[in-house]
Swiss-Prot record:
InterPro entries linked: DNA_methylase_N4/N6, N4/N6-MTase_EcoPI_Mod-like, SAM-dependent_MTases_sf
EC number: 2.1.1.72
Gene3D superfamilies attached to this UniProt entry: Vaccinia Virus protein VP39
Entry GO MF terms: DNA binding; N-methyltransferase activity; site-specific DNA-methyltransferase (adenine-specific) activity
Entry keyword set: DNA-binding, Methyltransferase, Restriction system, S-adenosyl-L-methionine, Transferase
EC top class named in words: transferase
Name of this protein: Type II methyltransferase M.HhaII
Annotated organism of origin: Haemophilus parahaemolyticus
GO biological process: DNA restriction-modification system; methylation
Family of the protein in this entry: Belongs to the N(4)/N(6)-methyltransferase family.
Reaction(s) this enzyme catalyzes, per UniProt: a 2'-deoxyadenosine in DNA + S-adenosyl-L-methionine = an N(6)-methyl-2'-deoxyadenosine in DNA + S-adenosyl-L-homocysteine + H(+)
Length: 228
């Protein structure tokens, strides 16, 4: 078992490991902000799309899925490792936006939803009625909640249009949107966490903004950084 002093050896690498194991390395109040894109089934279970296991549905279905209990476990750890005033950027789909994410926050009293952004992917996806063209980023802040001293850019709209130039991962996220959020809420050298990194877009943003990254993915990552 690793100890907290070992976590620096995992910084700025594509670690291939379970996110919960990564949390065990990180000491309390060490992370400035975090991104989390949980691999929940959500709308897929409700809609029962026929393309699951075929084409792009095959990629999505192959990813390990997180139960609500596992997601809550991650949220509990975010509360522990975030610095006071730190932000958690939580990606959700339309189903979880409508149903609400508050049950995931029941055991984390110092975390509060303070804002939300919509990512217009400029590409139409699935849907029996309206077709999916967007994803949602819930902005959660750790107490004490403050806006002016923790969010320094004020040109970020709450609807962000960005089409992916390439898609190395089935859940790829917008580089420029995430980069602007990093610039708004952190300083150079700060530590940024993504324990379900997927295509490692947050890592790329950190490299472009001179921030330190700590993150991992259970499936994706460099084999030389794989942890049992």
């Amino acid at each position: 078992m690793f100890s907290h002093q070992d976590y620096l050896s995992f910084v700025n690498k594509k670690n291939k490991m379970n996110g919960i194991d990564l949390f065990k390395l990180i000491p309390d109040k060490a992370v400035k902000i975090a991104f989390f894109d949980p691999q929940y089934r959500g709308v897929l279970d409700k809609m029962s799309y026929g393309n699951e296991g075929k084409g792009r549905g095959k990629e999505r279905a192959a990813l390990p899925q997180m139960t609500d209990e596992i997601i809550q476990q991650f949220i509990n750890e975010f509360e522990r490792v975030l610095l006071p005033n730190g932000y958690l950027f939580l990606w959700v789909d339309k189903f979880h936006l409508v149903e609400g994410v508050k049950p995931w926050l029941e055991n984390t009293p110092s975390l509060s939803v303070v804002d939300m952004l919509t990512w217009d992917k400029q590409k139409i996806g699935m849907g029996y009625r309206t077709r999916r063209r967007s994803e949602y980023l819930v902005v959660i802040q750790k107490e004490p909640k403050k806006a002016k001293i923790t969010w320094t850019l004020h040109n970020i709209p709450d609807v962000w249009a960005e089409k992916l130039q390439s898609k190395p991962h089935t859940h790829s996220k917008p580089i420029e949107m995430q980069k602007q959020l990093i610039l708004a809420t952190t300083q150079e050298g700060d530590l940024i966490l993504d324990p379900a990194s997927g295509g490692y877009s947050v890592f790329e943003c950190c490299k472009q903004t001179n921030r330190n990254f700590i993150g991992c993915d259970l499936i994706f990552g460099d084999d030389e950084n794989e942890q049992d």
